[in-house]
Amino acid sequence: MLKYNQKQLAFIILRRDFLMKRNVYRILGCFLFAFTLCIMTPSFAKASVKNIPQTKTSGTYTGNVDITGDENADSVIIRTTPDQEGWYINRFTIYLNGKRTTEISLRDHDCYDLTVKYAKMSKQHTFIQIIGRGENDYVTYNEIFTYNKKSNQFRVVKSFNDRSSYAEEIVTANKKGITVKHRVQPMETGWINWTLPFKYSKQKFIRTASSTKTVRSELGQNRKDKYSRYFAKNKFITAKKVTFYKKTGSKKVAFRVPKGKAVTLKKLIYSKKKIYLQFKYGKKYGYLRVNRANYNFEKPLFQNVNSRLSG
């Protein structure tokens, strides 16, 4: 049996500790390398939403995104063609990997420019949304497309061209579906926006909810005054005595609020093309129907809304 003096034993122990630590660091290094590879995996594999921007060439939109489902970037180009007067967009054409695929007429939509969005729920489900805007930035065209490999065409899976939908752009996407921002300017409250979820089923998008607590006032964004501070908090000051109702479409009174009091916008319900807003006053909740055609501007519901209406 080998015998060691104290110095030799100390050296052996130190060397053993060094080798053990080196092995630990090697294992840790391998783990970190593998982890880095995981997080550096191309984003094409993940659900995502992004803009396809307009290039320096006016009327052309270019993006490199996965359309065909192979998790590699495809070249997508949307080219617009103006009308004879040069005011509106007459049509747009979609090119995929250098090949012309689909042409859509915008002759009846009075669009000045486009917004192009890309949304990916999964490898199998990728979409292009094209939004056309006209006067006062109103949405006049809005459709979502997916690519069909067999026909080499982009086909519509959701049309928001019914203006009573109030839909604008896709804001999120995941394996379950998409979330779409909506926006409208009721005369009673001014501009508000909200989001609603859609699921993808049988090759089309279906809205899965009619109510949301995401509704927000936009009136506090452009001015700096005391009313802007209220609007930024979703609060409205009554301009007269206002009656709120217990349910949507109901005539049963929940409560009445005197002039000059603050109520808080809490919820939106969209039912049968009608918009109802839920407000909170103290500990009470009540509803108003808004966006009515016969609104009386001379007797507004809320203070300082009329002066902020656009269009």
Region spans (language model):
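Short aromatic loop motif centered on NTY/YTY
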Residues: 112-147, 153-232
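Residues in Ca2+-coordinating acidic/glycine-rich loops
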Residues: 65-73, 119-125
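Structural core positions within WD40/WD-like beta-propeller blades
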Residues: 74-78, 129
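Beta-loop motif signature
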Residues: 220-276, 280-286, 291-311
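Short, Lys/Arg-enriched N-terminal segments with co-localized hydrophobic residues
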Residues: 2-19
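Bacterial N-terminal signal peptides that target proteins for export
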Residues: 20-31
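Sec-dependent signal peptide cleavage junction
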Residues: 38-51
